[in-house]
């Protein structure tokens, strides 16, 4: 069995005139990263590999999650190929994962994440929002063979905010 946790990077800032890959988290993104990461500990596998896009906003999201979940920062593997908005490229990267890893936690981007969870999960999600968390379990033993999985947990910042 394989377990995949997809986390969309938190809300980024558009204030500074920087290249897309260099955009940093907005204050709301920082707040939402803390909010979600402080509420998912019980849903996470004990052992895992953590991958993040090399985009600044994804990396900052991953670091906040790591700090709140007490993951060593050096356990985050930053992968250029995760800086993609294309679900077929995301799928290719996931399917290339070593089978010795049962659990993958991935910080990435939309539209790739929403399209991936709708292709491989069993619950339709119109849009995975920033800082959104989706967990999918697959019965296959090989990442390269994953097909239809079961969506086991969905948690979005709006689920944790009370007016």
For each of these PLM feature ranges, what is it?
Residues 95-105, 147-158:
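A polyampholytic, Gly/Pro-enriched intrinsically disordered region
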Residues 123-157:
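Domain-level recognition of soluble alpha/beta enzyme cores
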Residues 2-82, 113, 123-128:
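Active-site-proximal alpha-helix that buttresses catalytic centers in soluble enzyme cores
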Residues 97-105, 110-131:
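Non-DNA-binding regulatory cores of transcription-related proteins
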Residues 1-2, 163:
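Short, Lys/Arg-enriched, disordered terminal segments
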Residues 82-98:
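Short phosphate-binding loop-to-helix
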